[in-house]
Each structure stands twice: as C-alpha cells, then as structure tokens.
Amino acid sequence: MKKSFGRRLLKKISKLIPLCLIIASNAALSQEGQKLYPAPLLALDNFFSHHILIAEKSTHLLHLYRNNDGHPELVKSYQVVTGKKSGDKGTEGDFKTPEGIYNFTNFLTNKQLIEKSGSQGVIYGAGAFVTDYPNPVDQRMGKTGSGIWLHSTNDEARLDKGLDSKGCVVTANNDLLDVSKYIELNKTPIVIVQDLVYLNDRTHEAQKNEIKKNIEGWLAAWKNKDIESYMSHYSPAEFKDIKGNFVHYKAYKKAVFSNPGTPKIDLDNMSILQSKNYAIVTFMQRYQSSTINDAGKKILYLRQDDSYNWKIISEVFTKNGLEGSDKIAFEPSMRFFKDSTFKENSESKKGNN
C-alpha cells in the first residue's frame, strides 16, 4: 500500500518538474536582465495571434503564449503526448506528429466524435480541434496524411507515456477545456516543434525585421505595379496557387497590373511565425482598385532560397478568420463547451489514438 502511494506521489511530482523548470528559467533570465523569446514567435498581434500554442515534443508540453505588445508572454503549460514514433511526420500512418505551423479549422464535440467514429469516438475525450495539416509547405515537401488534431482522452494514464498517439497532440480533458478558452478557429495557430529554441532580444528583432522588410518590398512593388520587382519575391521553382505555377501567376498579375489606375492596398494585424525551414506571415488585407474592392485574411508561406533570401511559395486569401474584427479585444470564454454536457468518465475504457 505504501509503495503504491509512493509511486503515485512520485508520478505527480514528475509531472510538475518541467513546468517548475520553465518558471525557474524565466526567473533566472529576468534576474540577469536578459530577454529571451521563443524562436517561432517573431511578431504577434491582437487579432490573428492574440494567443498561440507551441507543442514541444521533447518535453511533452503544450505552451500557451499571449501577445504582449507584439512579443510572446508565457501564460501556462500543459502536459501532452504526441506520436508513438519520434521524428517529423512524412507519410500517412507513420505514427509521427508533424512539425510546423498550423491553424485550427474546425472543432468536433464529444457527441460529434461518437457520431463520426461510433464507440471508438470516446477515445478522443472532451473534443478535438482539427488542424490544417498538411499545409502548403507540407504539400511541397510531399508529406501525406491527415487528421492531425489537438484533443483530449478518455484514458489520462496515457499522459505519462509521452509517445502514445497516432500523430495527434493529446492532453487531459480539463486541460483541453482550459486551453479552449483561448482558441479561435482560423486565428489561433499551433506551432509544433521537437525542441523549443529561444532567441535573445537582438537576434529575435533581426529575424523579424528581415522578413518584415521583405514583405514591405513586396507590398511596394505591388502598389507600384512593378511586375519584375513583385515577382522577384516569389520562388520560381516552388510557387503554386489556384492560378497555377510561377509562370502562370506572373502572366495573370501582368494582366492585372495593366489595368488603369493605382490600387490602394493596406495591410493590418500582421503576425510573423517561423518553423525550422519556413515562415508564415498573416495579415488583414484591404485592396481597392477601379474594378475590385475587397478585404480578407492573407497568409504568405515563405522559404529561404539557396542564397538565404525569403521567397513566397504559396499565398492563401480567405474570408475565414475575419469574424469579430469589429471587437476591441479578445475575451477568453468557454465558446466551444458552452452547451456541452460532457462529463469525464473515469471508468471508461482505454483509448490509443
């Protein structure tokens, strides 16, 4: 009996150690007068990145950050499990969790999961946030698979295993309910990394400004209808969109630029995130010309070429994620579980997603 109690106590203490180390590390940095920022979070804003999640596979932690005047501030961390196999996801069914930057596009309630998967739906716990894996960068790299979610579980003993999912990020039911308060679909990104790297203030600012300067040059060329300068910001080898490849897109933009008048283009609410081999710039775009008057969310996916110059490989324009643009500030709430009758059943069978 005493041994059993001791094991349970040790297990509880071990869960607290990673978070204690984070708090201690942050305190030490504050005392030394240094500023360190998570490398993936270069620039935040109050609309598209008021809160951001970083899942760190090596520590089995999900970190919640909030925007603090353009810089990330750690709010709290949650214990998670990821794919049964280590490494970056590459193919369908490899049991690996992808590494990159993703948006939540949908939320499935416990009831919907059971309707969708039958009795197996209970293994997803309270609910599931669906990501947009594979994103355009994943597709360029030939990655396959789908159904990468942030969800909870009906068997929280799994959380002690660290590597125990088919590729999803899995957390406790209460933690999913808590973190859901800070999530907005198509607005709250999740960055998945193997190891979370931190940058000092100077390096963080330099990397942010490098990408920001690139976007400013792209915008200036667009406003001036300078087709060669504009297309120099795109990757001839990798760029694709609904108009086709680089050559097709250039022909399309050349025709657009030939229209009379000068377009009025404004970018607001810009956020800049980076992964190990690409960056994502998200902003509100307003475009007005003699023939078009439109506004929406634009996402630019960029990769560095052989000369380390950032080039656009994909751009996505959508109306999704504009909801609430008239609000002054984001307010955390139980929006996804407002009408939920979900109650954790401690006697439920073990799941293994």
List PLM regions with ranges:
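Short, solvent-exposed aromatic-acidic interface loops
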Residues: 79-86, 150-155, 286-287, 314-326
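Surface-exposed, charged secondary-structure patches
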Residues: 96-97, 122, 251-299
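Gly/Pro-biased beta-strand-loop elements
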Residues: 36-149, 328
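Exported/periplasmic cell-wall-interacting domains
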Residues: 95, 110-216
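Short beta-strand edge/turn micro-motifs at domain boundaries
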Residues: 295-353
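Short, aromatic-enriched amphipathic alpha-helices that serve as compact interaction elements
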Residues: 207-226, 233
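Short, solvent-exposed secondary-structure junction/capping segments
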Residues: 231-244
